[in-house]
């Protein structure tokens, strides 16, 4: 991999007012909401009375292969991983450093490998961080592991291995696995259903769920919704998911949002509510069947929670998610961004204060420019960091707003 600090592409403001999201799910001038009506989005601006920034896109690192997740430390270092194994650090001086770490037990196949990564909120002092990976030992599963990072980012050693185990693994399809912290300090884990039909609705399975765990012990967070239910795994926070790819905490709130893949239709963004069932139920006629023709939110489930946004047809493969936050983003401040794999761009959602969808559009300058977008993440410096997922020739990008 190579560092390319200083290669910058500026995206004109003019593009911001013409790139509305269009898809087969809605008419050419509208966007489907969760209730099925359409609302035109002429611009991804949350605050139209404020200036729309130009976006300066800089390639920080290239020659990567499927970088999956990233996190920025308080010192400005960006830590990132690659799905087939390996951790790296982009240092503030532009140096890229490989982090020595043991991934000898990594299972990497299909959609599963080394996936989610998040720094502990106290990373500056405790140097702790967390990853999620396929595990090749025993019968195989997906596991969350805690690590300690060396002060110079040269090496990382395992602390709690595993912190959480038993996330289902089959062929490598639908492995999840995104990690983020909430405002209480709990570790949230978004999982995939492992393409097994019974998993999403089975409260004894960790597949097709979001989990909420104590990052010190891996035990359930004390007020999890199923801690008193003997028939459920107490780690579970929500269920009825297909393949959670993104988690995003809305600044200034306790609201956590997920982005997940639909089959060939209906990718979703959801506002996570404790104990809620999000309605994915792909059971077939025979045991072991995986029926992907069913709707993402099954109307036969009375309490199924509707998505706040759905792609309709075709699916565009929603992935990592983050909120823009800060005056430097001008009219973009407050937008929920979602990376698009098949859609090859960045979705920009405008939400009201209750989390309801107001409009959907595309962030300018990314449609097909960099291929498949895996992760979008706001850094501690207020800038946007992006990874691509093109099975080679991938990049780590930094996006700077310019008012």
Briefly describe each language-model feature range.
Residues 21-25:
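C-terminal motif of bacterial Sec signal peptides marking the signal peptidase cleavage site
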Residues 59-85, 316-323:
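Beta-strand-rich domains and repeat architectures in extracellular enzymes and scaffolds
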């Amino acid at each position: 991999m190579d560092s390319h600090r200083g290669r910058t592409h500026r995206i004109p403001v003019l593009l911001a007012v013409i790139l509305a999201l269009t898809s087969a799910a809605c008419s050419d001038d509208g966007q489907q909401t969760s209730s099925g009506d359409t609302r035109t989005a002429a611009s991804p601006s949350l605050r139209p009375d404020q200036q729309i920034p130009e976006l300066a896109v800089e390639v920080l690192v290239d020659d990567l292969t499927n970088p999956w997740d990233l996190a920025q430390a308080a010192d400005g270092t960006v830590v990132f991983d690659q799905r087939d194994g390996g951790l790296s650090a982009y240092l503030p001086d532009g140096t890229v450093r490989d982090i020595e770490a043991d991934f000898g037990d990594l299972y990497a196949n299909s959609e599963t490998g080394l996936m989610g990564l998040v720094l502990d909120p106290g990373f500056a002092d405790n140097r702790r961080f967390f990853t999620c990976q396929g595990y090749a030992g025993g019968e195989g599963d997906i596991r969350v592991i805690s690590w300690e990072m060396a002060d110079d980012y040269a090496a990382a050693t395992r602390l709690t291995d595993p912190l959480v185990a038993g996330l289902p693994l089959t062929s490598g399809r639908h492995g999840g696995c995104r990690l983020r912290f909430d405002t209480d300090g709990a570790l949230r884990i978004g999982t995939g259903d492992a393409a097994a039909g019974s998993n999403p609705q089975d409260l004894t399975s960790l597949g097709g769920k979001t989990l909420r765990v104590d990052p010190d012990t891996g035990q359930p967070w004390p007020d999890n919704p199923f801690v008193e239910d003997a028939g459920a795994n107490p780690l579970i926070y929500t269920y009825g998911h297909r393949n959670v790819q993104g988690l995003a905490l809305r600044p200034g709130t306790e609201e956590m949002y997920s982005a997940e893949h639909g089959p060939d239709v209906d990718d979703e963004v959801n506002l996570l509510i404790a104990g809620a069932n999000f309605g994915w139920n792909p059971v077939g006629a025979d045991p072991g069947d995986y029926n992907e023709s069913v709707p993402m939110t099954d109307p036969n489930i009375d309490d199924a929670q509707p998505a706040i946004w759905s792609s309709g047809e075709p699916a565009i493969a929603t992935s990592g998610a983050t909120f823009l936050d800060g005056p430097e983003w001008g009219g973009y401040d407050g937008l929920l961004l979602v990376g698009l794999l098949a859609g090859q761009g960045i979705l920009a959602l405008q939400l009201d204060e209750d989390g309801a969808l107001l409009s959907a559009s595309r962030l300018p300058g990314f449609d097909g420019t960099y291929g498949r977008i895996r992760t979008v993440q706001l850094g501690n410096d207020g800038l946007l960091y992006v990874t691509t997922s093109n099975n080679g020739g991938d990049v780590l990008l930094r996006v700077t707003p310019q008012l």
